[in-house]
Amino acid sequence: MKYKKKIFSILENLEKKNIEKDIINIKNLYLQKEKYVTQLSLLKDYQNEYLIKLKSKIELGICLYQWRNYNNFIFILYFLIKDNEQKIKKNQKILEKSLKQYSKNQIKLKTWNYLYKKYKKKEIKKILLVEEMISDEFSQLKNLAEGSCYNV
């Protein structure tokens, strides 16, 4: 029966390690998401700033090559913003998966804890039962030994 105790403790330790890995993974994903969101806001700010500059330059008169440069830069910013938004969505999906896995591992850990506690209670009952049987046998032998003295 000792092997059951070892199995439960091994399974419990495995789940604890899985939970720790999940927590680290979730923290990293949150940090990545935060980084992407700040990048996105910076890119949008740059885009708005350059759109305002381009508008004012157009009103004042702008050379064709300057207009192309501004337009190309704003176009590149547009694609960078779209790419960053896709990264945020992908990160969010991975984060949701990781949170689900974390909750599954928590449930497994609670299950192993419950089964281990149930096993311990059962083992304690067995030990108490054996002790009670030994005590009963001892008292029976003691009574028989005392009774045999009177029969002689």
UniProtKB/Swiss-Prot annotation:
PANTHER family in the record: FLAGELLAR FLIJ PROTEIN
Name the record gives this protein: Flagellar FliJ protein
This protein's GO CC annotations: bacterial-type flagellum; plasma membrane
Function according to Swiss-Prot or TrEMBL: Flagellar protein that affects chemotactic events.
Protein source organism: Buchnera aphidicola subsp. Schizaphis graminum (strain Sg)
Gene Ontology biological-process entries: bacterial-type flagellum organization; bacterial-type flagellum-dependent cell motility; chemotaxis; protein transport
Entry's family note: Belongs to the FliJ family.
Gene3D superfamilies (UniProt xref): 1.10.287.1700
Localization terms from the record: Cell membrane
Cross-referenced InterPro entries: Flag_assembly_chemotaxis_eff, Flagell_FliJ, FliJ
Keyword terms: Bacterial flagellum biogenesis, Bacterial flagellum protein export, Cell membrane, Chemotaxis, Membrane, Protein transport, Transport
Pfam families: FliJ
Topology relative to the membrane: Peripheral membrane protein
Presence of keyword Transmembrane: no
